[in-house]
Design a protein with these regions (language model features):
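Flexible cytoplasmic inter-helical loops of multi-pass small-molecule transporters
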Residues: 182-205
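Intracellular juxtamembrane helix-capping segments at the cytosolic ends
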Residues: 115-127, 317-330
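Structural signature of the two symmetry-related core transmembrane helices
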Residues: 77-91, 278-292, 373
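C-terminal transmembrane helical hairpin of 12-TM major facilitator-type secondary transporters
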Residues: 277-322
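Helix-loop-helix hairpin linking two adjacent transmembrane segments in secondary transporters
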Residues: 101, 138-185
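Cytoplasmic helix-loop-helix junction between adjacent transmembrane helices
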Residues: 105-142
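Conserved MFS/SLC helix-loop-helix module at the cytosolic interface between two early adjacent transmembrane helices
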Residues: 61-99
């Protein structure tokens, strides 16, 4: 890959963080609106959950098939093109008149919003080695803030003009961001001589050959499944008695998650200092404990907010640590590493959404919390019994 000819200035870091957050947010505007959308289309809770699942499966497909292109093509042009195509997907969602059309729009948006995952390795490439973890932490904080603040913004806009307004406004913002990225990003040409099938094949070969990548991908998969289990069903909890909250109020709970995400930013710095295994162990322990507070959230808003803060803090902390660790493996193949890791990550998110919607329908909030705590426990045991020892030794 060509040597970067453009310094990673603070202004460019901010632009890339906002772009990353805005891109990934497009997959999550629907979550606080699921109850409203379900009533609009006369859907059950589990059927409405397919809207979120479609976005995450589209995102997973984009991670696997589109993100590796960042190691093949000039990245500024690729990033801008994908940003515009994601905006088109949201236009389809905004104008949808059926569940099938809405699923199509959200799937297309998810497919092309993986532009966020081309921006992250680009930032890692532009950053100096001693600051790479901090830069990745900042960009990833932008990503998780986008996921969480999407709910707040969606709720407020839905209160003002209905749920369709959310997607009309978001599509315009994505188009404007494409213009800003065209003006702000440096040109970054790739020197790889692999063709597209070889690029995809190398993603799988890295998975087969690298134990650390497989470890971190599995941890990310299970961690993000936890995240999706909470946020997919929370709108149903808060829209029902005893809360009976509106879309706007439900969206405000995203602010608690945003605070937790910001608190995890130092995780990249700890990874830079060789403490990634400590950060991972501590984060997974807190993730399991967060479900206790979340369970009490069915009667206590304060307990729910505390649980959201802790869960989002740990999810983001483990995620930043994972990415900082894997970017050390093959510096010349960061887009392919991202493709492999993030495909696993969002497969976990899609599975978490399906599990959450089903758990809510059959077991209510207790069922959701049981599912989340079980997966958190499995995640911790997998790390502690096997992978933790292997990575510390490495």
């Amino acid at each position: 890959m060509t040597k970067p000819n453009h310094e990673l200035s603070p202004a460019l870091i901010v632009l890339m963080s906002i772009a990353t957050g805005l891109a990934v947010a497009s997959n999550y505007y629907a979550q606080p609106l699921l109850d409203t959308i379900a009533r609009n289309f006369s859907l059950s809770a589990s059927s409405a959950g397919f809207i979120v699942t479609a976005a995450q499966l589209g995102y997973a497909a984009g991670l696997l098939f589109l993100v590796p292109l960042g190691d093949m093509f000039e990245r500024r042009r690729l990033i801008v093109s994908m940003t515009l195509l994601a905006a088109c997907g949201m236009l389809i969602t905004a104008s949808s008149q059926s569940l099938a059309m809405m699923i199509l729009g959200t799937a297309l948006t998810g497919l092309f919003s993986v532009v966020a995952q081309i921006l992250v390795p680009l930032a890692a490439t532009l950053a100096s080695p001693d600051k790479r973890g901090k830069v990745v932490g900042t960009i990833m904080s932008g990503l998780l803030l986008g996921i969480l603040l999407a709910r707040t913004v969606a709720g407020l806009l839905a209160n003002l003009g209905g749920w369709r307004t959310v997607f009309w406004v978001a599509s315009v913002l994505m188009a404007l961001m494409a213009l800003a990225l065209w003006r702000g990003l440096p040109q970054m040409k790739s020197e790889t001589h692999l063709n597209y099938p070889q690029l995809l094949g190398s993603v799988f070969s890295m998975f087969i050959s690298d134990k650390i990548l497989r470890t971190r991908a599995l941890l990310g998969c299970l961690t993000f499944a936890n995240f999706s289990i909470l946020w997919t069903s929370m709108a149903f909890l808060l829209a029902a008695p005893p809360f009976n909250y509106s879309d706007g109020v439900i969206g405000l709970f995203g602010l608690a998650g945003a605070a937790g995400a910001l608190g995890a930013r130092p995780a990249g710095g700890f990874a830079d200092k060789g403490k990634s295994h400590h950060t991972t162990t501590f984060g997974l322990l807190l993730l399991l404990l967060s479900w206790l507070a979340i369970w009490f959230g069915h009667t206590s808003v304060l307990a729910l907010i505390i649980g959201i803060l802790v869960l989002d803090l740990t999810v983001q902390g483990v995620h930043i640590t994972n990415q900082t660790v894997i970017y050390r493996i093959h510096p010349d193949a960061r887009n392919r590493l991202t493709a492999g890791y993030m495909t696993s990550y969002f497969i976990g998110g899609a599975a978490g959404s399906l599990i959450s919607a089903s758990a809510w329908q059959h077991g209510g909030w207790a069922g959701v919390c049981l599912a989340g705590a079980t997966i958190a426990l499995v995640n911790l045991l997998v790390w502690w019994r096997g992978f933790h020892r292997q990575e510390v030794a490495n």
